[in-house]
Amino acid sequence: MPRRKQQAPRRAAAYVSDELKAAALVEDDVEPEEQAADGEPSAKYMCPEKELSKACPSYQNSPAAEFSSHEMDSESHISETSDRMADFESSSIKNEEETKEVQVPLEDTTVSDSLEQMKAVYNNFLSNSYWSNLNLNLHQPSSENNGGSSSSSSSSSSSCGSGSFDWHQSAMAKTLQQVSQNRMLPEPSLFSTVQLYRQSSKLYGSIFTGASKFRCKDCSAAYDTLVELTVHMNETGHYRDDNHETDNNNPKRWSKPRKRSLLEMEGKEDAQKVLKCMYCGHSFESLQDLSVHMIKTKHYQKVPLKEPVTPVAAKIIPAARKKPSLELELPSSPDSTGGTPKATLSDASDALQKNSNPYITPNNRYGHQNGASYAWHFEARKSQILKCMECGSSHDTLQELTAHMMVTGHFIKVTNSAMKKGKPIMETPVTPTITTLLDEKVQSVPLAATTFTSPSNTPASVSPKLAVEIKKEVDKEKAVPDEKPKEREKPSEEEEKYDISSKYHYLTENDLEESPKGGLDILKSLENTVTSAINKAQNGTPSWGGYPSIHAAYQLPNMMKLSLGSSGKSTPLKPMFGNSEIVSPTKTQTLVSPPSSQTSPMPKTNFHAMEELVKKVTEKVAKVEEKMKEPEGKLSPPKRATPSPCSSEQSEPIKMEASSDGSFKSQENSPSPPRDACKEASPSAEPVENGKELVKPLSGGLSGSTAIITDHPPEQPFVNPLSALQSVMNIHLGKAAKPSLPALDPMSMLFKMSNSLAEKAAVATPPPLQAKKAEHLDRYFYHVNNDQPIDLTKGKSDKGCSLGSGLLSPTSTSPATSSSTVTTAKTSAVVSFMSNSPLRENALSDISDMLKNLTESHTSKSSTPSSISEKSDIDGATLEEAEESTPAQKRKGRQSNWNPQHLLILQAQFAASLRQTSEGKYIMSDLSPQERMHISRFTGLSMTTISHWLANVKYQLRRTGGTKFLKNLDTGHPVFFCNDCASQIRTPSTYISHLESHLGFRLRDLSKLSTEQINNQIAQTKSPSEKLVTSSPEEDLGTTYQCKLCNRTFASKHAVKLHLSKTHGKSPEDHLLFVSELEKQ
């Protein structure tokens, strides 16, 4: 290939010294007119141009020009036209014989070249037969080059017309060109060189990485973003516009300075995607071209800075829809195709298009790559596309629409009703003619305004983002129309009345009225949920993903059953105090909140849907509700108007919900942060009345009646399944609740206590308290605390009250039942685990267990308040400190929060599942669903947690051959380690019996034993068995050491320290706080 002739670097005039410019331009002796302006500013060259310079000063030769670019843009159309046509003529002079003759007077340097004479020449030129088919008038010049026309210096910045060259009109003429010719002429690049004053490449780095500072060359002002610099240049006129059409075929033309075309360097596709106006979708060769485009068209004012608009592929009219008479070309890239523009649209519609939305053109080149299914008409019909098909509200961004759909659940309804009708959800719009298209676009695109105002947000789009996470299941199960958002969105519907007449087949409210309104559908879906949960529980398959925190495992479903099963002991207490929510661990009835709780900002909540449901299923419940609403109406009128869902829920003392759902419903459905129920409720409590009706229900309650409301025994068949279903719904959806203030929440404090408290409660079984005594203590307990937020540790002190109710709310009345502190403590733990945090998911198997027991009638298997009540207050205080630091937030060690007893059971079961092969090696076999169910029922661990624990152990054993309690399994000589006493055992059978001695019962009896019997056995056998297992020289001293946190005894201080650090995460230095010495018996 012949070597290219060595040339000086090719530069545009803006960057070349005057001498070089003069020298270079002299070679092109065709256009002496331009030399006059390009050369050194001498009288010889300047005189003939004097008059022209006044009208359109060159920025190079007249630094003190009278007109800024702003003024130039606002010059009359006539002068703009003449100046533009001057540029045009100089650029097309070579190949146009006719124009050469016209040009001759211009080459003469006499004063006769006046502006008027030039105007006449240009008018004559425009009326030339070559241009006749363009039908352009002076106000709409095209400045489009013929493919053959070229000019060697057309990209220089020196011609007189450069200041007022109307880039905007040139671009619009191109983008709106209607090709009626059959032949396609090659089109030069859309926008030729534009010189922005930029700094060295070192300062800027790559175009794509951006710059630390963008400086204006004229005044040296620094800006952080290119947009700010562009705005500044536009306001002050500190820029030069040399947008002249050039022809790529001419080798002598001046190329872009120091900035090789990105189209060559980076590949056309990439460069065009990057250097594209986000507003109108045009691609540019260089950043300078794009910037001047922004300045001239003011598009930078219309592009939202933080959230760029989707590339407007909205404008391409599909070929199928084009009318033959109005064929629009769709070139695939700026350089590929072009042609002589033909203006077939009337001036009126052209002006309309130019003034209202100049960017809506058929020329967007990437529409079909950006998801042509909807994007090709995106910008033009954004208000119709980003529109909720359920309630008709329009949104500015897809994110806002998504948030709206999630919050209101409209996406479920729209999809369902569309499927039922067999309708496609969105149909392709019909755009029959260009004029109608233009009219609709003018109406529907607010972006065309030149001020920096994005389309006005509809009220719906401002709906709180907090609610985005609100449960999809809730929305699925409720097809009740959402009234409030519709009212809020009416203004937006009025703004868009034209949408109704548009050709889009969106679903309307009328369509949705045909879909079922709820009622039986909700029951059916809940029924499905329950049956699938029960099936999963029976099959033993894990329900859903693992627990981020091991605390999520402790859901204690059988303790739930105890509390929920003892519903017979509850009685509808007449509310004697104003604004507290009655939550008792032994009450199961879930009367849905009356409508006064509907003052919340989120109109669609469980309360509303379930209220309607209850009314449909049984009107008797509604009667009960009304009875209870009356006293409430008298007692708490001020609270009823509270808009917060939390407080409006707390304002209803009649909702005696089961502690499993009532106590956290307010958090679950509330977009606002959950309030501390205790703080809110306590000041107005009148605890004197608390114990009044406590004794009455005991006789009937102990007989195992499942009457939810003891005043209305015949109604129980109606209420019980509903309360069960509702508790399913609440617990099932509880994982979506995200309380924002867990620290203020009594539930989170309960969660801290749950692990060790349940253990301690299980240890001893003192005689049961009489009902009267309980009533008295109840009153005393609440008298002490009625004026301040409750101290959660008081439940462990020597008031033998029902712990769960005390913890849940200081004003909640606790019926004196014979259920033990174990029951209530674990129930409160369940509440905190099941409801409080999104981290604590709930497996459906636990729900199914609870449900099975809800519908059966049975008495609670309960022992009585435990030895905790006999402990000293000092003891209680240290326990409080100890338990403050147990949860995972404080301790990061793995498995540190497992209940040690549960671990022992799991490890023993795992060891029992090992099978020895003929070669003497052990292979792991899976636990059967029945075995897992037994463990789950006893420990309260969910099936999912058990499955995950087993899977984790198996994974560790396969990967490393060992885990915490078992090493060397793969060698055939396993070593089992006891978690409690660190002894090492060689065979699975010995290990199992060893662990059973710790546990105090045999694993095979696990399924047969009731919780109480196991607790009794633990209390009886724990100390002796551990003394047998651990031996130490210190034993002779006659002392054993007991861990205060879990009441285990150890023979040596070392063992206790080891236990404290391993099991409870305590520092050995603190062992004095948590260890009590016992005399050897």
UniProtKB/Swiss-Prot annotation:
Keywords: Cell projection, Coiled coil, Developmental protein, DNA-binding, Homeobox, Metal-binding, Nucleus, Phosphoprotein, Repeat, Repressor, Transcription, Transcription regulation, Zinc, Zinc-finger. Residues 25-104, 141-161, 238-257, 325-346, 474-499, 626-699, 792-824, 855-897 are annotated as: Disordered. Residues 800-824, 856-869 have a biased composition (Low complexity). PROSITE patterns: HOMEOBOX_2, ZINC_FINGER_C2H2_1, ZINC_FINGER_C2H2_2. Residues 891-961 bind DNA. Induction: Up-regulated by BMP4. This is Teashirt homolog 3. The lineage of its organism: Eukaryota, Metazoa, Chordata, Craniata, Vertebrata.
